């Protein structure tokens, strides 16, 4: 199963091209690299982040209920989840911080019919462990919690407030397809465009 984590956005922009900064994510590439943090799902049930180190591949979306691009990409989040969950990939939304209330997050999920699990990260502990800093941002983890892909969903938005009519590169979908075929993704990391997590 693949877990997609989306985090909310603030006011940052990233170029629409692979990350050439040379900086690596704090997430260790070794198996079992995600710390076991006691978090809570939006429905109130417990969520141990260490579960991401086993059982299934996961796509994590870092989300915010008022980030313009999280709103714009909501349909894409839903269609990807519907398609790939049926093939054994797990999807999870991650909401860092306490800026937005649980009611605001529930309204966002209900409005766009996002039915995969939503996890709250009030202290940014998992967000920092993942090296995520933008919403929306996507991470693809294999069954051992190893990072396969991190960055933007596609190249539809190439700057904050600037979008193409249609995306010409589909970073996350390409990574998912490569993963299913036992291959490395065409790009392992891209710079997400969106809002900085505060």
Which residues does each predicted region cover?
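C-terminal motif of bacterial Sec signal peptides marking the signal peptidase cleavage site
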Residues: 5-8
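Bacterial signal peptide processing site
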Residues: 10-12
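N-terminal "domain-start" segment that seeds a small globular fold
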Residues: 16-50
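Short active-site neighborhood of thiol/selenol oxidoreductases, capturing the structured segment around
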Residues: 50-71, 176
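Short, thiol/selenol-centered motifs that function as redox-active sites or metal-ligating centers
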Residues: 64-74, 98-99, 138, 195-198
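Structural microenvironment flanking redox-active thiols in thiol-disulfide oxidoreductases
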Residues: 71-112, 120-129
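Short, internal strand/loop/helix patches
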Residues: 108-150
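Thiol-/selenol-based redox modules, centered on thioredoxin-like
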Residues: 142-198
């Amino acid at each position: 199963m693949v877990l997609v984590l989306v985090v909310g956005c603030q006011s940052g922009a990233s170029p629409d091209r692979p990350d050439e900064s040379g900086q690596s994510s704090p997430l260790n590439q070794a198996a079992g690299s995600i710390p076991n943090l006691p978090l809570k799902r939006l429905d109130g049930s417990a969520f141990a982040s260490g579960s991401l180190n086993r059982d299934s591949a996961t796509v994590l979306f870092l989300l915010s209920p008022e980030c313009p691009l999280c709103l714009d990409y909501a349909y894409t989040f839903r269609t990807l989840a519907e398609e790939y969950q049926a093939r054994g990939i797990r999807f999870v939304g991650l909401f860092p911080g306490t800026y937005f209330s649980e009611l605001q997050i529930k309204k966002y999920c209900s409005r766009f019919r996002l039915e995969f699990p939503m996890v709250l990260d009030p202290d940014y502990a998992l967000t920092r462990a993942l090296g995520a800093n933008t919403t929306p941002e996507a991470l693809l983890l294999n069954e051992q919690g190893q990072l396969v892909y991190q960055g933007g969903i596609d190249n539809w938005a190439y700057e904050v407030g600037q979008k193409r009519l249609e995306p010409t590169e589909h970073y996350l979908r390409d990574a998912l397809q490569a993963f299913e075929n036992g291959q490395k993704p065409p790009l392992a990391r891209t710079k997400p465009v969106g809002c900085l997590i505060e």
